[in-house]
Amino acid sequence: MELKGKKVLVAGLGVSGIALCKVLDSLKAKVIAYDEKEYDVLKENLEEIKSLSIDFRFGKFKKEFLEGVDLIVLSPGVPIDSDIVKTAQEKKIELLGEVEFAYRFSKAPIYAITGTNGKTTTTSLLGEMFKNTGRKVYVAGNIGYPLIYAVMEAAEDDFIVAEISSFQLETIKEFKPKISCIINITPDHLDRHKTFENYRDIKGRIFENQREDEYTVLNYDDPVTWSLKNKAKCRVFPFSRKSLLENGAYIKDGSIYISVNGNAEKIIDIEEIYIPGEHNLENALAASSVAYLSGISADVIANTLKTFKGVEHRIEFVDEINGVKFYNDSKGTNPDASIKAIQALKTPIVLIAGGYDKGSEFDEFVKAFNGKVKKLILIGQTAKKIRDTARKYSYPEDDILFAGTLEEAVKKAYESAKEGDSVLLSPACASWDMFRNFEERGRIFKKAVAELRR
């Protein structure tokens, strides 16, 4: 793609947008960087690009921003029904999403993972499996390292393992992974995608350009994910925790097996997998399937599963103070993710929950308390909504506390906990009402836990 001298507007100046600006500048494009937020809010983000020859625009979108623009590259945070997108379509200006734009530069094969929950763990785990073959691998995408950096650096015989979100899949056109994978689909981001059906269909776009000699790996146990198989033009490879499969990855007699064309091979005994929890077994099956189909040996897969310690902010053990264990699950940004965290812990739980309202319902989340959650500390926009749902299911009002800050919530949780209990931050909500992102929320939680020792 020849961009020298072309006028390119980058919409949205988060992590992806900053990366796009840097790469476009290096390609000698004339870059316009736009964000609807004001400069003061973004000042910190813009430090690394303010010295580049970029034309910055901030605040409410104006049609004149698009004057003479040849191409618009959208960051994932910019909705497709926004004014800038509508105006670009009216003016017939080429519009590419960040992932689509990056894909067009890629020389290396991309192995793409999506799903509502488990994406980051599965992507990181698969990345480790590739690394353990001795090959050069880039782990990128929604995981924090922008895909545009990975494709610019990766050579033809390297690998790119990419976590892809629904926001990124919304704008793909030609994007075609070598192998794709959908771990699961449960309601999320309905404030953006409007209906669950629309959200499901966007997730299914991950394999829409793959052909009959390529694979998509789908969760056989999740009816919503499995229903997408009928849309696939490529081969479908299932994984299951519950069923024996003639062709796919499955559990038999306490071990993971993978069968391709009827030839089954044992991979590992489940008890040897380092990271605990049923949800992590699902992640292990998904990553192992993609790795095996790409030619990685059972030995390398097994050794990685024995040593991989999980990812930050996902049921991450933080500390034990006076017999109370603290876990950071800030990545629990929807009810289903937080249900899995509650199920993974085997002790009584003091739960810190609440945050930005994405339009989620909390009935199943509250039902999962099931006698395990002894106290509920609520923060953020959804605090009252979760409280009302908890009361609907007869959760004792005396066991519900409110906190104005996460630091206050940690103190209240510690005061409510006894020796042998766990304090779990698993908000079941996004972080954007109080924090820049879930990583910042997780770091503040860990800092607040450390303060308890002082």
Swiss-Prot record:
Disulfide bonds: none annotated. It is found in: Cytoplasm. GO terms for molecular function: ATP binding; UDP-N-acetylmuramoylalanine-D-glutamate ligase activity. Its EC number is 6.3.2.9. It comes from the Bacteria. Keywords: ATP-binding, Cell cycle, Cell division, Cell shape, Cell wall biogenesis/degradation, Cytoplasm, Ligase, Nucleotide-binding, Peptidoglycan synthesis. One of its GO terms (cellular component) is cytoplasm. It is an enzyme of class 6 (ligase). One of its GO terms (biological process) is regulation of cell shape. Belongs to the MurCDEF family. This is UDP-N-acetylmuramoylalanine--D-glutamate ligase. It comes from Thermoanaerobacter sp. (strain X514). The lineage of its organism: Bacteria, Bacillati, Bacillota, Clostridia, Thermoanaerobacterales. The gene is murD.
